[in-house]
């Protein structure tokens, strides 16, 4: 062995012996501090640029971040090899939770794969692929696809099997029966059914939510301005149990958006209860689909024959009273914009 190699080995062993002695004498305090400084230097040298970038992204809004990542992935898609090497070197995940506020416009801020979690601890938006609730199916079942939905809609709307909750709500909204002996007759219900059949998308919305959410909910109907041809337009509220958390899965949100063209969806909270609100989008040029042809008289007769308990009627009467002052988010926005427009004129 050469003299240089011997010197290096002897220096190494002397340093090692010195370090061992320091460990024994000081209880490893010095060695831990040295190791801490080394690890902190490694972290600062490796991840400082990453921290700067992630900090900048955190300051951006949701729309700006979406545009940034859209341009970023378009650029990296040009070269798959560089994309793979870049992803391997990343230390900060691209996907993360995002806090939102209510009311939340689902249509305007929807991106495929988004899911929404609402609870008393806060409201968050995240990717369904990274969401444990979506992965394990904790809060949602798989909603039906559109072809199956159309067939089920036509069948169940006539047979009232899946629409009993909605029937109860419609009867309470229309008013008390004009006949006695336990039977139900009300011309107001017939008028509501005629107008609602012109908004068949609301029935699609009800069936989609019922098939895609495992949480119990109540459904309310409310007039929301004028519709086509001077007939009243209706909004539908899906009210969930007060104080209970709500998770809207990525698959469900996708179905709500694509099964209901020309309608707007909002997540909101009222009197401690989370709710989904679906209203006609007055700015949309998409006409109401006319795929389903049902006789209003036939549907009315079937709805009148449904047995509704007094307890259920009382629950819905109380709920309608609670929401008598509630204004849908879309209407609130229009009311806020109207004075501003008037001032400009």
Swiss-Prot record:
<keyword id="KW-0479">Metal-binding</keyword>
<dbReference type="GO" id="GO:0008270">
    <property type="term" value="F:zinc ion binding"/>
</dbReference>
<keyword id="KW-1048">Host nucleus</keyword>
<keyword id="KW-0863">Zinc-finger</keyword>
<feature type="zinc finger region" description="CCCH-type">
    <location>
        <begin position="115"/>
        <end position="247"/>
    </location>
</feature>
<dbReference type="Pfam" id="PF02718">
    <property type="entry name" value="Herpes_UL31"/>
</dbReference>
<keyword id="KW-0472">Membrane</keyword>
<keyword id="KW-0597">Phosphoprotein</keyword>
<keyword id="KW-1043">Host membrane</keyword>
<dbReference type="InterPro" id="IPR021152">
    <property type="entry name" value="Herpes_UL31"/>
</dbReference>
<dbReference type="GO" id="GO:0044201">
    <property type="term" value="C:host cell nuclear inner membrane"/>
</dbReference>
<keyword id="KW-0862">Zinc</keyword>
<protein>
    <recommendedName>
        <fullName>Nuclear egress protein 1</fullName>
    </recommendedName>
</protein>
<comment type="function">
    <text>Plays an essential role in virion nuclear egress, the first step of virion release from infected cell. Within the host nucleus, NEC1 interacts with the newly formed capsid through the vertexes and directs it to the inner nuclear membrane by associating with NEC2. Induces the budding of the capsid at the inner nuclear membrane as well as its envelopment into the perinuclear space.</text>
</comment>
<comment type="similarity">
    <text>Belongs to the herpesviridae NEC1 protein family.</text>
</comment>
<dbReference type="GO" id="GO:0016020">
    <property type="term" value="C:membrane"/>
</dbReference>
<dbReference type="GO" id="GO:0046765">
    <property type="term" value="P:viral budding from nuclear membrane"/>
</dbReference>
<comment type="subunit">
    <text>Forms a heterohexameric complex with NEC2. Interacts with capsid vertex specific component 2/CVC2; this interaction directs the capsid to the host inner nuclear membrane to initiate budding.</text>
</comment>
